[in-house]
Amino acid sequence: KRKKMTTINIFTENIFDGWQPDEKDVIEKTKRLLEFYISELEEKSCLNNRDYSTITLDIVFCDSKKTQEYNRDYRNKDYPADIITFAIFADDENSFIFDGEINLGEIVIALDKVIEGVNRDISLSLNKEQELFFLISHGLMHLLGFDHQSEEEYNFVIAEQRKALECIEYDKI
């Protein structure tokens, strides 16, 4: 468990016209999700045995055309995604830390896909914000180095997300 305080910097950018999530709310809840993950999972994450005082990450809101472009350009997959993560720190074997600051990377979310998902899955009765924070919590797991290549890993990631979402009172997901 971490003894010293960690500063968390979250920067958001919205290039999607169809919905403007509340930036303050996004930053505050994302910080709480990340704090939960650090307190629960640091030893299993890419932060283990690292000396840091600050964690930085970016969240970009866009449309599915943009995520398709990213998928095509960086992952050789030509289809849109609801979320793409660029885990700069977890994926770099050098794990560069500058002045105690770790840049975890970037979460890119297609807000049109979020809206589409909520409208499609009426039976789940999630609102846009719940769906959005489900995706953000998932992206944070990837930025911390967790993946889900196997069913076991997938179940672990989803179980941890559910616990984290309880911290921001989105435990119905």
Q: Where do the protein language model's features map onto the residues?
A:
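An acidic/histidine-cluster motif and surrounding catalytic segment
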Residues: 1-133, 144-173
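A conserved beta-strand element that flanks and buttresses the S-adenosyl-L-methionine
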Residues: 136
